[in-house]
């Protein structure tokens, strides 16, 4: 290919960032992974989920990575049920995985809770009651969704969450524990 030749390689591949992370799982140094719950060693099937400007997953097993565009899939009924319990009719505005689990989704959840429109970084960096309420609900919903994904994908090698939204949400031990508690119910 032109790319490979220009770089001086025999072959070159363009990979989605989540696919690249899936291939890197077996060689990531310990400092690059923050384990928030116990799991089995690598070697079993794993799932990498990226939550940032959008939502995507990659399934990883035995050196093979299969990417999937999950962001445009419908939210599971369990997540929709909680959204409607908390938000009433406003909960119906979240109909796809990415409409909730993304930076844009975090901001939309904050607004649906009746708080002022703002960007995701201000929400996750906030120490206000409004910011905390949004982040805690987002963490609960993410934990519930993680449980759904583990039933669907059976990632015995672990579920790896990645992306700017996940880093911001799990920077607090409280919200990391909320995700785990919901995922393990």
Language-model segments: residues:
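ATP-binding/phosphotransfer module of carbohydrate and carboxylate kinases, centering on a glycine-rich
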Residues: 8, 84-185
